[in-house]
Amino acid sequence: MFKFHAIKLRINIRPPNSKSQGFWLHFGLAIATFVGIICLAVLPAITQQPVTVKVLIQALEGTQWEPLVEDFNNEHPNLRLEVVKGPNNTNLVEDLYTSAFLLGDSPYDLVYMDIVWVQKFAAAGWLSSLSDRVTETQLDAYLEGDVNGGRYEGKLYRMPFRTDGGMLYYRTDLLKEIGAEPPETFEELMTLSNTLQEQELVPWGYVWQGKQYEGLSAMFTEILEGYGGFWIDADTQEVGLDKPEAIAAVEFLRDTISEGISPPGVTTYAEEETRRLFQNGNSAFLRNWPYVYSLASDSEIAGKFAIKPMVHQPEHGSGACLGGWGFGISASSDNQDEAWTVIEYFSRPEVQIKYFLETGYVPAKTSLFNDPQLVAKFSYLPDLLNVVQNPVLRPPVAQYAQASDILQRYLSAALTGSQTPEQAMQAAANETRALLKR
């Protein structure tokens, strides 16, 4: 057996004498004072660290943001905006956001979104509604299409920042040479192209984005609008891809190739391939986005081109496919008020003017299209306003990415001749209906 022995500890405490008592009293006061000074100096630094608001963005635009980020951080010492630079491919940025949300709490407080991401992200519950943070009067300052593109089921999930819209570029000098006005209809576009080519003034009449990618869906949205057709009615879920108007829209694009108005390789062209053809003087007409204007203004066709809304059938109107970017707030963020502070900063007119002057992007605020500073540098902005005020949205449905993939595949089949327009559009409509039912 084990034996335990108690150990007694005796401590003798003697009353301090007056000298030692005074010493310890002063020593204790000195220690307390020192600790107090340390707490006053250190605790605020610990408890008042800046709150970090993180956002993922394409690398190119992230670099362009750097002056604004620096200004924001200097202006808000208790906040720190941190930009994570992702790939320049927008689809890959969307994938990174999606992966972050699917894995749980997203590391991003702000969500910088393409307009076609909004419904998918909102339907999944990944975004916080902004409806209680902004009034309708404040939203009236923005292009209506950009605001509507940020809504899902009646609530606002994206605050517009910059916009985009498809349009028709045309050579003013070539049209002047044949004594013609710019085209208003599809038929006039074909006739003028043919005339210019027959007179050997230009190799190709009209170039557009025919590659199988998102740009094909965007371009086709405008042609479809011009024929009076529709893709998906977001309210009723009706699909219009197999209707006569949609088939006629596909046939028009096929005709531009078969009649030699567009080059055979147009079915492999994205924005840049078509821009270079037009900018190098090899095409009379071009469908593209606003970014082309600044680049073409520094080329051999400077001063020899203009822009207008897309052509259309006489009995129907024109529509510019709406693009653009804006801000949402992650539903899982612990810093939602701070994220809104960032959005408010980027919404200030003086901040936007500074940014657009440097980058050439197009504002989403209507008043900025006539701002003297911006117009002095980008004289086309007032004309561009006429284009983007007549927008056509890609279908604002939660399954947009899958619907676009379906359309791209079957459009490509029709344009390359592996299926007839009727066959391709019927199949596209059937797959889209099945998708929406799921």
Q: Can you describe what each PLM-predicted range is?
A:
Residues 192-195, 199, 235-267, 310:
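Glycine-centered hinge/linker elements that transmit conformational signals in sensory
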Residues 2, 24, 30, 49, ...:
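Conserved C-terminal helix/tail region of periplasmic/extracytoplasmic solute-binding proteins
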Residues 74-75, 80-85, 98, 156, ...:
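Extracytoplasmic/periplasmic substrate-recognition and gating elements
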Residues 113-165, 181, 190, 216-221, ...:
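Hinge/lid segment of periplasmic solute-binding proteins
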Residues 153, 157-161, 166, 190-239, ...:
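Extracytoplasmic/periplasmic solute-binding protein
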